[in-house]
């Protein structure tokens, strides 16, 4: 099974937040990927906290999470998910993660409880870390 990490899951791990143990276990034992859109989200949050952007790439390599470039197929699917996720306020980054999970037939991993309200509608299995 492949796991697709949302920015919230990676941030929880990197910052020792609740749910970090769940993410750590997945990364140690399973194949994990992350959309380049979600990498940008994580990087933005970490830069806001003073981390150098170059450190993000090193950290992802150390975590053994494979980055996946956001391509036209993902972008099109991401846009199509807008209608079924708008009512719970999912962002572009959220939908990018869900789109990638749908395409790779993986499980999306997040700390955002709103995702459980749309998982069935977008045909993606969602694992809540908290």
Question: What spans do the regions from the language model cover?
Answer:
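Short active-site oxyanion
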Residues: 1, 29-32, 64-66, 102-107
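Short, well-structured N-terminal submotif of metal-dependent ribonuclease cores
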Residues: 1-34, 46-58
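Alpha-helix capping/helix-boundary segments
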Residues: 9-10, 38, 74, 96-97, ...
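Conserved SAM-binding loop
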Residues: 12, 67, 90, 108
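A general structural signal for well-ordered alpha-helical segments in protein cores
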Residues: 20, 39, 53, 75-78
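Acidic catalytic patch
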Residues: 64-86
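Acidic, PIN/NYN-like endoribonuclease modules and their adjacent C-terminal/linker elements
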Residues: 98, 102-130
